[in-house]
Amino acid sequence: MARIAGINIPENKHTLIALTAIYGIGKKRSKFICSIANIPEHSKIVDLNEEQIDLLRTHVAKYVIEGDLRRERTLNIKRLIDLSCYRGLRHRRSLPVHGQRTKTNARTCKGPRKPIKK
């Protein structure tokens, strides 16, 4: 398996799809990386030579990915909670942050129903 950014990339998949195994790289960014590196999107990782894989590594390294991206996201949420702004309070209470209704929906955020005690 080819290792890019510390992640084992599946070799039997097309380059476009294989790069999406890296957290922080979706299809759009993967397509952009392939076009910059002049690598066909539909060629499989097995068919690429070492130079092309090194080229992919250098282009992927330019982005904030994997652990750094996860850390950045958690620090952003922690910052909102520490500020006690509206979005931070919603995060703290595990409620929807972007103004969605909560009377009937939002079961995923709220968690399972709590029984009413009589």
Swiss-Prot record:
The keyword DNA-binding does not apply. GO terms for cellular component: cytosol; small ribosomal subunit. One of its GO terms (molecular function) is rRNA binding. PROSITE patterns: RIBOSOMAL_S13_1 (PS00646), RIBOSOMAL_S13_2 (PS50159). Keywords: Ribonucleoprotein, Ribosomal protein, RNA-binding, rRNA-binding, tRNA-binding. GO terms for biological process: translation. Disulfide bonds: none annotated. Residues 94-118 are annotated as: Disordered. Coiled coil: none annotated. HAMAP family: Ribosomal_uS13. Located at the top of the head of the 30S subunit, it contacts several helices of the 16S rRNA. In the 70S ribosome it contacts the 23S rRNA (bridge B1a) and protein L5 of the 50S subunit (bridge B1b), connecting the 2 subunits; these bridges are implicated in subunit movement. Contacts the tRNAs in the A and P-sites. Belongs to the universal ribosomal protein uS13 family. NCBIfam families: uS13_bact. Part of the 30S ribosomal subunit. Forms a loose heterodimer with protein S19. Forms two bridges to the 50S subunit in the 70S ribosome. This is Small ribosomal subunit protein uS13. It comes from Buchnera aphidicola subsp. Acyrthosiphon pisum (strain APS). The lineage of its organism: Bacteria, Pseudomonadati, Pseudomonadota, Gammaproteobacteria, Enterobacterales. The gene is rpsM.
